[in-house]
């Protein structure tokens, strides 16, 4: 795979999420629960933000020649959370739901604007790290698949959720 082609695809796929969020529109709608259980669009964005921050930090560690090892004890998980401010999503100790609920709760009282701004900045960090990586480093660390999984493949899961919710909340809205 060519790095520039991958970055172009990454940005194109990203635009699909941004267009959908913009179509949902008003702040009040973005914070209404029901997109995914009790989650709002804001909660989905916070969830994506935390997973992207995890990815961005691992990419930066790779660029710095550091080695990430998933947490294997609860003490290590707690220390990771204290250091990074998000769960160690790579730890085999975590189930699927607990870290996601923690993330949503962490951002509960953070404004929508701040969540969106942080998420945009983290996405830019991912693109920047990708641009800095050599093709050898990308291949050695399976970066294309990791970035795809942590960004646009993840977006697509939640785009479906948001579209389903939006179709019920605003059935006459332009699709």
Predicted regions and their residues:
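A structural motif
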Residues: 89-101
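Acidic/His metal-coordination segments adjacent to aromatic residues that form catalytic metal sites
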Residues: 2-5, 85, 99-113, 138-142
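Charged, amphipathic alpha-helical oligomerization/scaffolding segments
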Residues: 12, 16, 118-121, 125
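Extreme N-terminal tail/first-helix region
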Residues: 1-16
């Amino acid at each position: 795979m060519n790095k520039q082609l991958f970055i172009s695809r990454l940005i194109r796929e990203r635009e699909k999420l941004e267009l959908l969020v913009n179509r949902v529109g008003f702040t009040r709608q973005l914070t209404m629960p029901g997109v995914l259980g009790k989650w709002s669009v804001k909660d989905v964005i916070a969830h994506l933000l935390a997973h992207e921050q995890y990815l961005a930090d691992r990419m930066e560690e790779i660029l710095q020649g550091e080695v990430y090892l998933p947490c294997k004890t609860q003490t290590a998980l707690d220390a990771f959370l204290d250091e990074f401010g998000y769960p160690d999503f790579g730890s085999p100790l975590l189930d699927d739901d607990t870290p996601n609920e923690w993330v949503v709760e962490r951002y509960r009282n953070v404004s929508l604007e701040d969540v969106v701004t942080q998420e945009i900045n983290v996405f830019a960090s991912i693109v920047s790290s990708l641009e800095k990586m050599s093709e050898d480093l990308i291949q050695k660390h399976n970066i294309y698949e990791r970035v795809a999984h942590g960004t646009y493949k993840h977006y697509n899961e939640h785009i479906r959720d948001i579209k389903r919710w939006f179709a019920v909340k605003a059935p006459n809205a332009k699709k």
